[in-house]
């Protein structure tokens, strides 16, 4: 096998994401003519501690959201350093970009510029070696197909309705395989559409393909999903479980949680009790960002109350950052990390966060962003690291479906070697 393949060109362009906002796409060409292409996603509800997504700020173009500065950084500063380097040395590539940037949060070059290059290099390397991306990143033991965490009702910043919690999801942990899990989710999605229509609700969809009905309360969203699970012929709490992403940083004001849609303002202790009640009443297996990103005390309360039986995922809390994750592990808060490549900005830093989480007994859930592209890197990544869980939207909208379809291809390629762990993917809780 080759051990040195030279990078001969690094080129970026501005393209559009699924929310009609500009984003960065990067092509990396190698000495043998092989090319790797990667497009970068973008979030709507972003954590305050995420790496910087460089935007142009020129209001006369794309409402200030252009990424031509980031593109230029790739085509000049980054390309000048990386051309001539060995594409197989991912650690050196990412380290070089981190040093070129020189800031704690990628503010100079932009995490969107750096991530595009980092992923395009990995893809070019895999292509040159004739390997699948998941095999290249994960090696010979990359084999676990993930349980989908599928967003089917949107609220909060992902939808224009009065539901406070941002995402209501289903997880087919009782399925025997990934393809069967996907089928189950698809059937529940269709059943939910029919259920909402029959009750007079709108069936327009949000950024991630989930429905965005103007429901009366957060709890009603859970109830209507449970109806849909049953309508599709499955058993809630056995075949399919519920997962929530309240995105609590978005509703945290002056030390309290404002559930405006329900006309309630709760203290951290009361908010924790709110989740306890929901988890006792419904088959909730996972709650993401149940508390705000800087409410460490609230997180501690929530973890002590239900951290042994519900997966508590830190997204805004950890932002795929080993420093923040390390603090959380020491404090004993949460038991899982959401992995978003663009929160940190390079592939190797992402892999470091996953490794740290797993060493501490935390699960890692690989995730999309609300602004996505047709890029399917996260489908390969989740299998590469055997994470066992993926969050990439509803089984609708082609930028979401692209990831599921890639996982179907990987499942087919792995054949008998592939594993779908179902409930065993939740090694962080008592089931």
UniProtKB/Swiss-Prot annotation:
Signal peptide location: none
InterPro entries the record matches: Enolase (IPR000941), Enolase-like_C_sf (IPR036849), Enolase-like_N (IPR029017), Enolase_C (IPR020810), Enolase_CS (IPR020809), Enolase_N (IPR020811)
Function in brief: Catalyzes the reversible conversion of 2-phosphoglycerate (2-PG) into phosphoenolpyruvate (PEP). It is essential for the degradation of carbohydrates via glycolysis.
Pathway the protein contributes to: Carbohydrate degradation; glycolysis; pyruvate from D-glyceraldehyde 3-phosphate: step 4/5
Name by which UniProt lists this protein: Enolase
Protein family per UniProt: Belongs to the enolase family.
GO biological process annotation, one example: glycolytic process
Main enzyme class: lyase
Lineage top rank: taxon: Bacteria
Binding-site residues for Mg(2+), renumbered to this chain: 245, 288, 315
Xref: Pfam families: Enolase_C, Enolase_N
Residues that coordinate or bind (2R)-2-phosphoglycerate: 166, 340, 369-370, 391
Catalytic site positions: 208 (proton donor), 340 (proton acceptor)
Gene name, Swiss-Prot/TrEMBL: eno
PANTHER family xrefs: ENOLASE (PTHR11902:SF1)
Keyword Secreted: yes
Gene Ontology molecular function: magnesium ion binding; phosphopyruvate hydratase activity
Cofactors that this protein relies on: Mg(2+)
GO cellular component, one term: cell surface
Catalytic reaction(s) noted: (2R)-2-phosphoglycerate = phosphoenolpyruvate + H2O
Bound cofactor: record note: Binds a second Mg(2+) ion via substrate during catalysis.
Sorted UniProt keywords: Cytoplasm, Glycolysis, Lyase, Magnesium, Metal-binding, Secreted
């Amino acid at each position: 096998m080759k051990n040195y393949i030279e990078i001969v060109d690094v080129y970026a362009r501005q393209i559009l994401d699924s929310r009609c906002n500009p984003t960065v796409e990067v092509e990396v060409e190698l000495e043998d003519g092989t090319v790797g292409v990667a497009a970068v996603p973008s979030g709507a509800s972003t954590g305050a501690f995420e790496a910087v997504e460089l935007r142009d700020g020129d209001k006369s173009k794309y409402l200030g959201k252009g990424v031509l500065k980031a593109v230029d950084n790739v085509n000049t500063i980054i390309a000048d350093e990386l051309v001539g380097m060995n594409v197989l040395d991912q650690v050196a590539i990412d380290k070089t970009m981190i040093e070129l940037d020189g800031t704690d949060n990628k503010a100079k070059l932009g995490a969107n510029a750096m991530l595009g290059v980092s992923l395009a290099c990995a893809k070019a390397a895999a292509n040159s070696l004739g390997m699948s991306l998941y095999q290249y990143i994960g090696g010979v033991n990359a084999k676990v197909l993930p349980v989908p965490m599928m967003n089917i009702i949107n609220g909060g910043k992902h939808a224009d309705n009065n539901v406070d919690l941002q995402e209501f999801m289903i997880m087919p942990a009782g399925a025997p395989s990934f393809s069967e899990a996907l089928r189950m989710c698809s059937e529940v999605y269709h059943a939910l559409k029919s259920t909402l229509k029959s009750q007079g609700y709108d069936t327009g969809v949000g950024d991630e393909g989930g429905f965005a009905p103007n429901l009366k309360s957060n709890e009603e969203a859970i109830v209507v999903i449970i109806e849909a699970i049953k309508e599709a012929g499955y058993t809630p709490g056995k075949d399919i479980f519920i997962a929530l992403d309240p995105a609590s940083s978005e509703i945290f004001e002056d030390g309290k949680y404002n559930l405006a849609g329900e006309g309630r303002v709760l203290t951290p202790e009361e908010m924790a009790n709110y989740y306890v009640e929901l988890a006792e009443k419904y088959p909730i297996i996972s709650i993401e960002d149940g508390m705000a990103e800087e409410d460490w005390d609230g997180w501690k309360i929530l973890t002590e109350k239900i951290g042994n039986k519900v997966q508590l995922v830190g997204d805004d809390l950890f932002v795929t950052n080993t420093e923040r994750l390390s603090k959380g592990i020491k404090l004993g808060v949460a038991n899982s990390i959401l992995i978003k490549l663009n929160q940190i900005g390079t592939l190797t830093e992402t892999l470091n966060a996953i490794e740290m989480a797993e060493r501490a007994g935390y699960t890692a859930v690989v995730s999309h962003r609300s602004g996505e592209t047709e890029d399917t890197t996260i489908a390969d990544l989740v299998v590469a690291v055997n994470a066992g869980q993926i969050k990439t939207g509803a089984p609708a909208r082609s930028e979401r479906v692209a990831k599921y379809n890639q996982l179907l291809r990987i499942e087919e390629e792995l054949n008998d070697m592939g594993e779908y762990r179902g409930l065993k993917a939740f090694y962080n809780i008592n089931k």
